[in-house]
């Protein structure tokens, strides 16, 4: 599933193409993928202009001048593909990104007044697109539960500490994967952030020091921003319509590098299973806690490797 940087990349790509466009037709072949009644679509979608594209957690929100919004969750295999003055798309890498559309994976289509089109494709039909009154978007159960946005100024060490309090007996990796703790974090960026923070993923939340939490807050922000600058990182299951893959993983610290030398100390990276997920660590830079009450942490600081932006 795409994580925050991949969805942010989609948001930025869409913003350049569809803002100010007028929607003239909207079709869907699957009510689960686009669960709105025809009368809702006719009243609030047809004839509407797009005024903004934004992101909350892993969800895209397309705001309309009718005070309604299209809320889009790509889930595992979703795609958004634009065909018009230029072709663009992002999502699960199959032929639908570059082939003729609509095809058998297309479950919704928007057509604009200039003849351009936006297709919502989803091979496994887990993703969805919903039309809602804009004031109701933040009241969706998903948004009511999701944690704070990590790239905002409001996301501080104090906020992270408060969000983790109810998970004091959980392993830190499990707590960070919980979307009610922090929005948009997934397996890749949790592993990377914990490595930079010198925290073993099996450390209990209640055993973390204030210094560790401060480092973790900053490194979550840093890793996510580096990945956005690199165009994302889900190279196996997330590409754009030109076949470009986010290149964050080319310079990843630990994720996907089992058996390779740590970029800092040279020790082979190990792969464990924590919280039911494959987990990558350096056993020297991230020593396992001696006991659940006394986690071990090195005192030396880490100077992160610079990730290169996509050229």
Language model features by range: what are they?
Residues 45, 143-146, 199, 238:
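Short clusters of hydrophobic/aromatic residues that line enzyme substrate/ligand-binding pockets
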């Amino acid at each position: 599933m795409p994580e925050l940087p991949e969805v942010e990349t989609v948001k930025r790509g869409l913003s350049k193409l569809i803002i100010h466009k007028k929607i003239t037709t909207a079709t869907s072949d699957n009510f689960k993928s686009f669960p709105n009644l025809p009368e809702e679509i006719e009243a609030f979608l047809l004839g509407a202009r797009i005024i903004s594209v934004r992101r909350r957690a892993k969800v895209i929100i397309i705001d309309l001048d009718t005070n309604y919004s299209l809320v889009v969750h790509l889930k595992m295999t979703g795609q958004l593909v634009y065909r018009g003055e230029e072709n663009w798309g992002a999502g699960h890498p199959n032929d639908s990104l570059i082939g003729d559309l609509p095809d058998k994976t297309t479950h919704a289509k928007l057509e604009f007044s200039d003849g351009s089109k936006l297709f919502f494709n989803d091979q496994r039909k887990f993703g969805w697109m919903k039309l809602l009154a804009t004031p109701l978007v933040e009241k969706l159960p998903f948004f009511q539960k999701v944690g704070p946005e990590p790239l905002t100024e409001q996301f501080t060490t104090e906020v992270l500490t408060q969000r983790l309090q109810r998970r004091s007996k959980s392993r830190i990796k499990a707590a960070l994967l919980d979307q009610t703790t922090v929005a948009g974090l997934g397996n890749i960026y949790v592993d990377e952030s914990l490595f930079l923070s010198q925290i073993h993923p099996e450390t209990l939340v209640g055993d973390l020091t204030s210094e560790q939490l401060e480092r973790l807050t900053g490194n979550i922000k840093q890793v996510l921003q580096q990945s956005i600058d690199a165009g994302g990182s889900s190279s196996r299951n997330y590409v754009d319509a030109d076949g470009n893959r986010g290149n964050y993983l080319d310079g990843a610290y630990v994720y996907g590098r089992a058996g390779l030398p740590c970029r800092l100390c040279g020790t082979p990276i190990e792969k464990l299973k924590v919280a039911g997920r494959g987990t990558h660590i350096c056993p020297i830079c991230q020593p396992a806690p001696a006991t659940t009450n006394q986690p071990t942490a090195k005192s030396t600081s880490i100077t992160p490797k610079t990730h290169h932006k996509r050229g």
